[in-house]
């Protein structure tokens, strides 16, 4: 699902909200979450999951075109850990499809 598809779904389910209002709310929420992670903070949405940063250590990679070894610096990458309610819901729906 893309951001625009999410906006359309919310507008469809919540008839009182305009598309522009939903778009602004989602953009604001995502911007705030990005800023929070950029400062090293953790985000927890109970029942859904948590977002945090994990450190990826420096390593030697490979250029896929040339096969040449390349030194990659260490960096922080965003990480999502689903909450129990989300995991349970996904598993219930998955079992229903089988």
Swiss-Prot record:
Signal peptide: none annotated. Keywords: DNA recombination, DNA-binding, Transcription, Transcription regulation, Translation regulation. Coiled coil: none annotated. One of its GO terms (biological process) is regulation of DNA-templated transcription. It comes from Pseudomonas fluorescens (strain Pf0-1). Transmembrane segments: none annotated. The lineage of its organism: Bacteria, Pseudomonadati, Pseudomonadota, Gammaproteobacteria, Pseudomonadales. Belongs to the bacterial histone-like protein family. Heterodimer of an alpha and a beta chain. PANTHER family: DNA-BINDING PROTEIN HU, INTEGRATION HOST FACTOR SUBUNIT BETA. One of its GO terms (cellular component) is chromosome. Pfam families: Bac_DNA_binding. The gene is ihfB. This protein is one of the two subunits of integration host factor, a specific DNA-binding protein that functions in genetic recombination as well as in transcriptional and translational control. GO terms for molecular function: DNA binding; structural constituent of chromatin. InterPro entries: Hist_DNA-bd, Histone-like_DNA-bd_CS, IHF-like_DNA-bd_dom_sf, IHF_beta. This is Integration host factor subunit beta.
């Amino acid at each position: 699902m893309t951001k625009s598809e999410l906006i359309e779904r919310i507008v469809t389910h919540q008839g009182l909200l305009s598309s522009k209002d939903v778009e602004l709310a989602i953009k604001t929420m995502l911007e705030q979450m990005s800023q929070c992670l950029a400062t090293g903070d953790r985000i927890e949405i109970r029942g859904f999951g948590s977002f945090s940063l994990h450190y990826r250590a420096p390593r030697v990679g490979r250029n896929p075109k040339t096969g040449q070894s390349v030194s990659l610096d260490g960096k922080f990458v965003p990480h999502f850990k689903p909450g129990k309610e989300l995991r349970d819901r996904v598993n219930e729906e998955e079992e229903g499809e089988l």
